Every structure is written in C-alpha cells, then in structure tokens.
C-alpha cells in the first residue's frame, strides 16, 4: 500500500441498533471511518454487514443511534439525500441498466451533478450542451481509469460479470463521492478478476483520494488492502482494529476466521 496520510474521522457511527419487528439485525454498533482510509466490515453470513451499509446510505432508518458525516448528524435521511452529501454505494447484486451501454450506465451516476433544467438538456443547447460535454469528459476519464474503453458502447448485459462489476464501480465513481461504500465488490469473481478489482480499489483510494468502506468475504483481500477492520457477528461488534490485531483476536477467530464462511 502507498504511504498515504490518514486524516481525521469523517464518518462516525454511534450506537446503531436496527430491528425488523421482533428481530434485532444490529445491536449497539459503534465505529468510525477516517478520511482516505480503507475501512472493511467483515463477519459471517447474516452478521449484519449489508444492514450496516443500508443504515449508512439511507436505505434503512436505524431504530436507535446516529450517524455523523463531516459534522452533520443524521438518522432519517433517504438514499438521495445521503448521496448528495457525498456518500455513494455499489451493491452486491448488480442493479445496472442491462440494455444500456457502458457509457450511458456510468453517465447515470452524474444525475446528481446536473444543474441545467430538463428542457435545456433535451435541446442540448448553450449551457446545457457545455454541461453535458463536461459530464461526458468525467465519464470518459473513469472509463479509461477502469480500462473498459473497448466496451464503451456495448450493452452492459452483454459483458462478462467481472466487467459489469467495473461498470458498477464506475457509476459510483461518477458521483464523485467522498466516501464509497462497496458491498462485496469481488463476489463471484475469479482470481484474475479479483486481482484487477483490488488494484482498482487501491487506485481509487490513492489517486481519487476517496475514503472506502468495504464489505468483502475474501479474507486475504481484506487483510491485504484494509487500514482498519471492524468485525460483526449476529449483529454485534466483536472486533475492531488494524488487520493484524483483528487476525489475532480470539473472538474473531472463533466467530469468523476459524469457520468456513
């Protein structure tokens, strides 16, 4: 990993609990994320990892607790409001527009950045045309960065799974997030695809300066690229620290590392 400088806390999760009826998905979870770091969340299936991301990006409203991003505390924000604050997310199950091209899928991530009205956008004249050209320039940069130039006009549904994952990452990057939430970005990939995605994640963190919160089942990946790791089990936090510290935590070994998850 590069000699990057980790900044101050920009995302602070405090005492988050989440209930679905009588089922408690998360219980009193607290952790923070520092600027420019890669912060991983691990745990067995059903540990509450995706539920935690859903609370951060406004899909779920926590039953208790609060989340503070750059000094602003929120507990009742929808996904769009969270995105406008500068938090973007990819999902474990791809939600791409399969019939649309790669470039149009990534362009859809620019929606929050569009300032001209719909009428001017449709006419593509004056400021609207210049704005669209600027957005397309940003998107082309992302396409080059992710090494998918050859597929710019290809419908996403025709691409191999690993390339679709890159497009999903590209769409999130098009939002220019300060914090990027990645929900199992390497799920279903072969070794070569995982190595490529690891490289892209590290480069996003290093070159774009984007803070990353990562859920990933591949423990080798987590330990190699993370600055700090928080561990969940049955909706509770059982470990938190640097990778080596977590690797040697007895509770973590029993709950996760010592199992076949």
Predicted regions and their residues:
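Glycine-rich phosphate-binding loops of nucleotide-dependent enzymes
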Residues: 2-261
